[in-house]
């Protein structure tokens, strides 16, 4: 049985921290993405202005979407940890299932089911890759015993062979 992770803050702080981190990642990534998109889809002579305008209008929206996903996922992750009283990869997969379903619930039963299963599968792949990379990294960083040179043969102390 895995023990609780005491290196992180309590859940309310973790939820707010994850929401902010996801919002920041979405906003920065959205600014880069939408500025490139605005640059490419503008007439000559207005490329810089269009890139800035596209980034200013669309990046906060993408940041908000990322933030909602991160906050919901972190909330469900803390709830699952509290219910299961375990710290293992299944928590993230279950939280991903709930997050995908909650975000798609406005689309009806089929969208909720597909969103929940899809998000759980994505989180399962992420968790599996994390475990595989962790094992691979642990194998490379395994302690190795130092090489001890062989002891000289007994009875022969000189380096030169005896004369016959």
UniProtKB/Swiss-Prot annotation:
GO cellular component: mitochondrion; TIM23 mitochondrial import inner membrane translocase complex
Membrane topology (UniProt): Multi-pass membrane protein
UniProtKB keywords: Disulfide bond, Membrane, Mitochondrion, Mitochondrion inner membrane, Protein transport, Translocation, Transmembrane, Transmembrane helix, Transport
One Pfam family, short name: Tim17
Chain ranges passing through the membrane: 13-33, 60-77, 89-109, 114-134
Record bears the keyword Disulfide bond: yes
InterPro entries in alphabetical order: Tim17 (IPR005678)
Molecular functions (GO terms): ATP hydrolysis activity; protein-transporting ATPase activity
Locations listed in the record: Mitochondrion inner membrane
Gene Ontology BP term (one): protein import into mitochondrial matrix
Keyword Lyase: no
Disulfide bonding pattern of the chain: 11-78
Annotated function: Essential component of the TIM23 complex, a complex that mediates the translocation of transit peptide-containing proteins across the mitochondrial inner membrane.
Family: Belongs to the Tim17/Tim22/Tim23 family.
Quaternary structure (record): Component of the TIM23 complex, at least composed of tim23, tim17, tim50 and tim50. The complex interacts with the tim44 component of the PAM complex.
Name this protein carries in UniProt: Mitochondrial import inner membrane translocase subunit tim17
Species per Swiss-Prot/TrEMBL record: Schizosaccharomyces pombe (strain 972 / ATCC 24843)
Top-level taxonomy: Eukaryota, Fungi, Dikarya, Ascomycota, Taphrinomycotina
